[in-house]
């Protein structure tokens, strides 16, 4: 056991750490939520992680994305994630896929090779495609709902999509998942009423703490599932 994971081992035991080391997790979207998912998975000792994102780091990401720094602006998010992961755990197997996961390229990726899948994508069409395909190969998946226009991290919850409320993205997903035959879906969502900025800009407002908290909650659900808690 690497010394860097000794304190985690005290929680999960040697068997749990071995399960984490042997796990392969896919994270789709490494922005405000997904970046924190990756961070916590790497620091928990997950042995293999694949990340999928086609975006580059922008200065406007610095307020909430853990990979966004002055010296990473302009870099591919997946590459920044890879370099950061290797700094945390040089032994990790980390694959960076620079792409937007969409229905027209979904056949390129074999989801059955993953222990767990995290959906931190913004686009409804892509989310539905990923979720449906994960369900088709019986790979557990957890999906992030909206974290923009929110300030209360304490109002984040883990629930089935059918039991969500207040979240506009979750409302859309509840409606659309029926068309895809998706009966169950674990999500992290916020019960907080969205705070809509009083201007003409439709870009969601964001804080440093709500997306990050959502990502850490998701990572916790994944880790607990892998070790059998």
Residue ranges and their predicted role:
Residues 1-25:
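N-terminal charged helix/coil linker that caps or initiates catalytic domains
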Residues 33-34:
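Hydrophobic/small residue at the entry helix of a nucleotide-binding pocket
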Residues 27-29, 52:
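Conserved N-terminal Rossmann-fold NAD(P)-binding element of oxidoreductases
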Residues 46, 51-89:
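Glycine-rich phosphate-binding loop and adjoining beta1-alpha1-beta2 segment
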Residues 97-106:
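Conserved SAM/SAH-binding loop
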Residues 2, 109-116, 121-129, 133-137, ...:
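Glycine-rich phosphate/adenylate-binding loop
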Residues 42-48, 136:
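Conserved S-adenosyl-L-methionine
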């Amino acid at each position: 056991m690497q010394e860097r994971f000794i304190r985690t081992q005290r929680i999960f035991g040697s068997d749990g750490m071995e399960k984490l080391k042997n796990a392969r997790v896919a994270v789709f979207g490494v922005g405000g939520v997904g970046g924190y998912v990756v961070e916590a998975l790497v620091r928990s000792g997950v042995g293999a992680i694949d990340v999928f994102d086609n975006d580059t780091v922008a200065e406007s990401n610095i307020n909430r994305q853990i990979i966004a720094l002055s010296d990473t602006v302009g870099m591919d998010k997946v590459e920044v994630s890879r370099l950061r992961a290797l700094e945390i755990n040089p032994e990790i197997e980390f694959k960076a896929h620079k792409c937007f996961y969409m229905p027209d390229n979904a056949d390129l990726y074999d989801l059955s090779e993953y222990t767990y899948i995290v959906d931190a994508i913004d686009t409804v069409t892509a989310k539905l495609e990923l979720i449906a395909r994960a369900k088709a190969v019986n790979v557990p998946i957890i999906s992030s709902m909206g974290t923009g226009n929110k300030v209360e991290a304490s109002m984040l919850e883990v629930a089935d999509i059918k039991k969500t409320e207040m979240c506009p993205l979750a409302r859309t997903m509840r409606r659309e998942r029926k068309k895809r035959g998706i009966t169950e879906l674990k999500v992290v969502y916020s019960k907080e009423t969205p705070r809509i900025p009083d201007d003409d800009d439709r870009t969601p407002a964001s804080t440093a703490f709500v997306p990050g908290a959502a990502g850490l909650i998701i990572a916790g659900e994944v880790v607990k599932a892998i070790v059998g808690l």
